[in-house]
Regions:
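Walker B catalytic acidic pair
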Residues: 125-127
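Conserved NTPase motor "head" modules and their coupling/switch loops across ABC/AAA+ ATPases, GTPases
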Residues: 2-121, 130-134, 138-141, 147, ...
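Conserved beta-strand scaffold positions in the cores of enzyme catalytic domains, especially
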Residues: 148, 166-168
């Protein structure tokens, strides 16, 4: 929980400016890390969190045995994404949720690069087809540096990409 909360804190700093630029300044992204455990401060040290987690497990042990499933733990934690104060999951359009997801992906990439001084390999599957031309240009300009693989069904979408190489695949074979 501690490490996830600290990573979300970094995402909270990195993703909103990316999303703001990506959306043309019209949307504000906010992130909240939630846990089903009784943890008042997920940013607390692991030493402080351990007794709280053990207590939570002990109190829910019988319910977990009865339901034959794990009712708490990191797999039950969640990252809540809001756009302009509203839940992206509940109220976001397909375009808004796609933009938010890509903003998070780009923020993760930039955090990794800042920590390691290396760009991670970035894989984007058919991402350009669902974006308008301004957002396509934003993505293509933002992913400079490192190794990037973009799948695309329409070659003209890659016209703004400089320094890249296109591979054509047909029927599962490289042409």
């Amino acid at each position: 929980i501690h490490y996830r909360a600290h990573f979300v804190k970094r995402l909270q700093e990195a993703a909103p400016p990316i999303h703001r630029d990506f959306s043309g300044g019209g949307e504000e992204l906010s992130l909240t890390y939630t846990t089903v455990s009784n943890i008042p401060d997920p940013l607390a040290s692991p030493k402080e969190l351990l007794p709280l987690l053990l207590d939570h497990q002990a109190r829910h042990k019988q319910a977990e045995l009865d339901s034959r499933q794990c009712l708490s733990g990191p797999h039950k934690d969640d990252l809540l994404v809001d756009i302009n104060g509203l839940s992206a999951k509940t109220y976001g359009s397909q375009g808004q949720t796609r933009t938010a997801a890509l903003s998070l992906k780009l923020a993760q990439r930039e955090i990794f690069q800042a920590e390691t001084e290396e760009w991670p390999v970035l894989l984007l599957d058919d991402v350009l087809s669902e974006l308008d031309s301004r957002r396509q240009a934003f993505i293509l300009n933002r992913i400079r540096g490192g190794q990037v693989f973009i799948t695309c069904c329409e070659e003209e979408k890659l016209e703004g990409l400089e320094g890249g190489k296109a591979f054509h695949v047909q029927g599962g074979s490289l042409i």
